[in-house]
C-alpha cells in the first residue's frame, strides 16, 4: 500500500512537471541527423522547413508545407531567405548551417528557412538524390503559394542553393516564370547537370537576379556560366588551403566544393569585400588585363556574396552569357585579397625578362608579400609594364616597400634592372594615396628596400 502511495505521488509530480514544461518551453526542431547506414540503405524523401527569425534565432520552428498560417514567428511581410543544401552522402548535417543562419539574422530580421531534405539527399547513389531535386522544388512551390496567399510577394523571396540545392532553387524559379526576387547558386552541382538545357538546371532566367559562385569546376561543380554574373574564385578550381592529394580523405573531395559556401558566409560579415574583376578568363585576370570597371560607375568592381545585388541594374541588361568575374582569395576566413597595380618604367637599354616579388611593411611592423605572376614580365626601355599584385593583409599606411627582381636562371650572369619610376596604385581601396619611387637599380636576387613617397604626378 505504501509503495502504491509513493508511486501515485511520483506520477502526480511527473504530470505537474510535464504540464509546466508544456506551457513554458517551446519545442525546438533540428536538422535531420542521419549516418552512413542510412546512406547505404537509402532514405525516402521527406522535407522539413526550419524557420529562424530574430525572435527565435536558435530554436527552429517546423513549418507545415501546406499551411503558412498559424505560425508564431513567420511574418510574410519580411524578406524570406530559403537555404537549400545539396547531396549528403554521409547523412550528417552541413557544418555551415548554424553559421549562415546566424549571419543572416545579424544583418536583418529575415525569415530564414532552412530546407532540410536530408531524407532524400542521403544516399550512396548520387543519381537518386539528383532525381529528388524536382520533387523538393514542387514542395517548396506549394509552401510559397501559401505564403503568397497570406500577403507575401515574389520580390521578397531569396533562394540560396548549395550544389544540388542551386538547381532546386532554379526549378522553383521556373515555376514562377523567373519572378522571384533572387537566386544565389553556390557551386551548383555539375554531375548529371553539365550540358543540360536551361529547363533542366539553374538558369539566369529563373529569377530577377541570379548570381553564381563556382569553386570546384573540375570536380563536383558546374563549369559554364549560369547567372547574370558568375564568380570564379581562384579560377574556379583549386582553392587555397584545400588538400591537393587524396591522402587527405573526404576533405580532398569536398573542400573545393564547400569553399563557395564559406566565401558567401564571409561576405555576410562584410569585414572586407571579396572584389571580383569582370574578365574573359582567369589568365587575363592574373596578368592584370581586367581591372577596368568603368562600366559599373559610380559603383566599383562587383563583390561576391550577399551584396552582389547592388550591381543588379547593370548586370541584368546584358545579353547572355552574362558577366564572368575572377579573383583570388586567401586560404582562411575572411579570405580577402588586397589588390595593387605595380607599374614599372625602366630605362635599361636591353630588354629584361623576369619576376618581381614585393613586400609591404606597415607602421607597426607587419609584413605581407606578393610574387606578382607565374609568367615572366617583359621590361623594355621607356615602356611601362603593369603588374597585378595581391596581398592577404591590408597594410595602411605603408611605411616601407621591398622589391626583388629575378630572371629565374640559376646559371649565367646576374642582371640589373634600371628603374626610372615604380608606382604602387591601390585597387581594392582606391581612395588611398598612390605611392612612388624614382631612379633606382634592382640587382638580381637582391632585395631592395626603400621608403615610398607620394607620386609627383599620378597621371604619369
UniProtKB/Swiss-Prot annotation:
**What's a GO biological-process term for it?**
lipid catabolic process
Query: Which terms are listed as keywords in the entry?
Result: Cell membrane, Disulfide bond, Glycoprotein, Hydrolase, Lipid degradation, Lipid metabolism, Membrane, Secreted, Signal
Q: Which InterPro entries match?
A: AB_hydrolase_fold (IPR029058), Lipase (IPR013818), Lipase_LIPH (IPR016272), Lipase_N (IPR033906), TAG_lipase (IPR000734)
- Membrane topology, from the record: Peripheral membrane protein
Q: What are the record's GO terms for cellular component?
A: extracellular region; plasma membrane
Q: List the disulfide bonds.
A: 242-255, 279-290, 293-301, 436-455
Catalyzed reaction equations = 1-hexadecanoyl-2-(9Z-octadecenoyl)-sn-glycero-3-phosphate + H2O = 2-(9Z-octadecenoyl)-sn-glycero-3-phosphate + hexadecanoate + H(+)
Q: What is this protein called?
A: Lipase member H
Naturally occurring in which organism (per UniProt) = Xenopus tropicalis
Per UniProt, what is the name of the gene that codes for the protein in this document?
Answer: liph
Amino acid at each position: 500500500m505504501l509503495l502504491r502511495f509513493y508511486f501515485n505521488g511520483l506520477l502526480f509530480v511527473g504530470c505537474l512537471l510535464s504540464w509546466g514544461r508544456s506551457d513554458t518551453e517551446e519545442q525546438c526542431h533540428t536538422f535531420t541527423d542521419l549516418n552512413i547506414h542510412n546512406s547505404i540503405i537509402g532514405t525516402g524523401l521527406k522535407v522539413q522547413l526550419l524557420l529562424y527569425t530574430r525572435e527565435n534565432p536558435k530554436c527552429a520552428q517546423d513549418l507545415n508545407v501546406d499551411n503558412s498560417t498559424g505560425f508564431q514567428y513567420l511574418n510574410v511581410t519580411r524578406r524570406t531567405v530559403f537555404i537549400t543544401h545539396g547531396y549528403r552522402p554521409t547523412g550528417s548535417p552541413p557544418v555551415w548551417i548554424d553559421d549562415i543562419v546566424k549571419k543572416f539574422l545579424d544583418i536583418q530580421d529575415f525569415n530564414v528557412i532552412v530546407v532540410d531534405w536530408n531524407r532524400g539527399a542521403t544516399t550512396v547513389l548520387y543519381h537518386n538524390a539528383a532525381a529528388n531535386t524536382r520533387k523538393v522544388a514542387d514542395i517548396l512551390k506549394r509552401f510559397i503559394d501559401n505564403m503568397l496567399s497570406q500577403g507575401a510577394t515574389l520580390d521578397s523571396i531569396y533562394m540560396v542553393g548549395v550544389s544540388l540545392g542551386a538547381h532546386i532553387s532554379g526549378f522553383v524559379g521556373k515555376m514562377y516564370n523567373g519572378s522571384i526576387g533572387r537566386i544565389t547558386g553556390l557551386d551548383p552541382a555539375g554531375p548529371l547537370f553539365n550540358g543540360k538545357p536551361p529547363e533542366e538546371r539553374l538558369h539566369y532566367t529563373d529569377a530577377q537576379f541570379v548570381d553564381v559562385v563556382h569553386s570546384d569546376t573540375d570536380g563536383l561543380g558546374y563549369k559554364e556560366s549560369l547567372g547574370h554574373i558568375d564568380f570564379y574564385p581562384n579560377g574556379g578550381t583549386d582553392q587555397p588551403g584545400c588538400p591537393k592529394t587524396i591522402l587527405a580523405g573526404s576533405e580532398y573531395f569536398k573542400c573545393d566544393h564547400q569553399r563557395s559556401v564559406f566565401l558567401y558566409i564571409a561576405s555576410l560579415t562584410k569585414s572586407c569585400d571579396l572584389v571580383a574583376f569582370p574578365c574573359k578568363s582567369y589568365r587575363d585576370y592574373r596578368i592584370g588585363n581586367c581591372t577596368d570597371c568603368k562600366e559599373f560607375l559610380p559603383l566599383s568592381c562587383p563583390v561576391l556574396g550577399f551584396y552582389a545585388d547592388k550591381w543588379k541594374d547593370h548586370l541584368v541588361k546584358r545579353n547572355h552569357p552574362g558577366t564572368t568575374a575572377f579573383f583570388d582569395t586567401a586560404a582562411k576566413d575572411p579570405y580577402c585579397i588586397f589588390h595593387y597595380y605595380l607599374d614599372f618604367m625602366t630605362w635599361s637599354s636591353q630588354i629584361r625578362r623576369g619576376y618581381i616579388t614585393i613586400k609591404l611593411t606597415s607602421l607597426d611592423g607587419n609584413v605581407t608579400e606578393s610574387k606578382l605572376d607565374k609568367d615572366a614580365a617583359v621590361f623594355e626601355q621607356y615602356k611601362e609594364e603593369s603588374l597585378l599584385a595581391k596581398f592577404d593583409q591590408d597594410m595602411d599606411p605603408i611605411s616601407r616597400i621591398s622589391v626583388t627582381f629575378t630572371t629565374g636562371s640559376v646559371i649565367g650572369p646576374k642582371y640589373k634592372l634600371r628603374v626610372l619610376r615604380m608606382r604602387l596604385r591601390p585597387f581594392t581601396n582606391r581612395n588611398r594615396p598612390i605611392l612612388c619611387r624614382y631612379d633606382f637599380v634592382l640587382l638580381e636576387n637582391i632585395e631592395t628596400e626603400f621608403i615610398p613617397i607620394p607620386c609627383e604626378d599620378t597621371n604619369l
